[in-house]
Design a protein with these regions (language model features):
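Glycine-rich phosphate-binding loop
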Residues: 51-53, 59
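Short, conserved active-site entrance elements at the starts or edges of catalytic domains
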Residues: 17-47
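Alpha-helical transmembrane segments of helical membrane proteins, especially in multi-pass transport
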Residues: 58, 62-64, 68-70
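Terminal amphipathic alpha-helical/low-complexity segments used for targeting or macromolecular assembly
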Residues: 1-29, 151-153
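A generic structural motif
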Residues: 46, 54, 64-66, 133
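Short beta-turn/strand-loop junction motif enriched in small, turn-promoting residues
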Residues: 55-56, 108
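Glycine-rich hexapeptide-repeat left-handed beta-helix
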Residues: 67-153
Length: 153
């Protein structure tokens, strides 16, 4: 599924770059329906990009991904939810992932100012909304989760 989704994205991206209306998004939505992988045709993705077990992968429109990047199921490269999100139209809203990065299952990396450096490994179930320097590893430690009362529930 990952190969198919990437192949369809590459075709859609070229059409997107040539300002072809609607068709690029239709192509990526067909790929999404067949694979469970949602890559916006506006995303910029380098060479040697690999998606393994891709169900639930979401890559937003202004995401930039470098070369030799590998991601696993459930990864979201998305925008932060903001009250004034409409003000960010035509601006960088999604993260930048540099070269030689591995992002494991169910990690969420959010925000246009978020940059993941070269040679970084992002562990599973990690939620990131700030930049990570080159040559780092980010992991979720179960001792650090919090349980809070729900408001109104």
């Amino acid at each position: 599924p990952g190969f198919y989704a990437i192949m369809m994205y590459r075709l859609a991206h070229e059409l997107y770059l040539h300002d072809v209306p609607l068709l690029p998004r239709i192509i990526t939505e067909i790929a999404h329906a067949k694979t469970g992988i949602d890559i916006h045709p506006g995303a910029n993705i380098g060479h040697h990009f690999f998606i393994d077990h891709g169900t639930g992968v979401v890559i937003g429109e202004t995401t930039s991904i470098g070369n030799h990047v590998r991601i696993y199921q459930g990864v979201t490269l998305g925008a932060l939810s903001l009250n004034d999100a409409h003000k960010l139209k035509n601006k960088k809203r999604h993260p930048t992932i540099k070269d030689n990065v591995i992002i494991y299952a169910n990690a969420s990396i959010l925000g246009g100012d978020t940059v993941i450096g070269n040679n970084v490994v992002i562990g599973g179930n990690v939620f990131i909304y700030s930049s990570i320097e080159d040559n780092k590893m980010v992991v979720f430690e179960k001792e650090n989760y919090k349980i809070k009362d729900r408001k109104g529930g």
